[in-house]
């Protein structure tokens, strides 16, 4: 009898690997794409898993497995890898997939010293709520893998020493006009 592989969650707890959850995430990311194989990504990923692997490393392994399948004949793997990368970035930035409300996000990053306080001085809560209504976070799902990696590597506010990410693409784009207000 095989014992389930134990993984290390983001909070440090150990628990058995949940292959069904991994399958659901890859299947979700593959929705609507042509010539991508969820099972191919799973197979390429699973052989790299080891006892105690961190869930964040599992996610990075899956992203790399999808990216490695990008070719002239199977270009949609670039979108599969991108969607998985966006999912991972949001988990790193917010602790979960769904981004917070814009005002709450800005307030938090001002408090952390990542955004300038002028952002809160220059706009009312109502204006932030109105701007939040313009954001469609699902636009991130149309990016290519190369675009997501460019955003992550060059443009998103982050701690370049620890790799901690503080924002996602749609917040970046909305706040770009006020980038002078970002510390």
Mark where each language-model region is.
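Extended catalytic cores of very large enzyme megasubunits
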Residues: 1-183
């Amino acid at each position: 009898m095989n014992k389930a592989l134990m993984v290390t969650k983001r909070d440090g707890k150990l628990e058995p690997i949940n292959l069904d959850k991994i399958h659901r995430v890859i299947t979700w990311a593959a929705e609507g794409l042509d010539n991508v194989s969820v099972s191919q990504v799973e197979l390429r990923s699973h052989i790299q898993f080891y006892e105690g692997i961190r869930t964040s490393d599992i996610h990075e392994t899956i992203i790399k497995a999808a990216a490695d399948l990008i070719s002239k004949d199977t270009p949609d793997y670039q979108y599969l890898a991108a969607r998985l990368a966006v999912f991972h970035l949001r988990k790193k930035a917010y602790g979960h997939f769904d981004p917070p409300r814009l005002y709450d996000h800005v307030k938090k990053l001002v408090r952390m010293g990542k955004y300038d306080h002028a952002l809160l001085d220059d706009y009312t809560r109502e204006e932030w709520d109105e701007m939040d209504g313009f954001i469609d976070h699902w636009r991130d799902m149309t990016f290519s893998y190369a675009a997501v990696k460019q955003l992550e590597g060059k443009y998103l506010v982050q701690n370049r020493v620890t790799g901690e990410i503080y924002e996602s693409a749609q917040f970046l784009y909305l706040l770009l006009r006020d980038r002078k207000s970002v510390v």
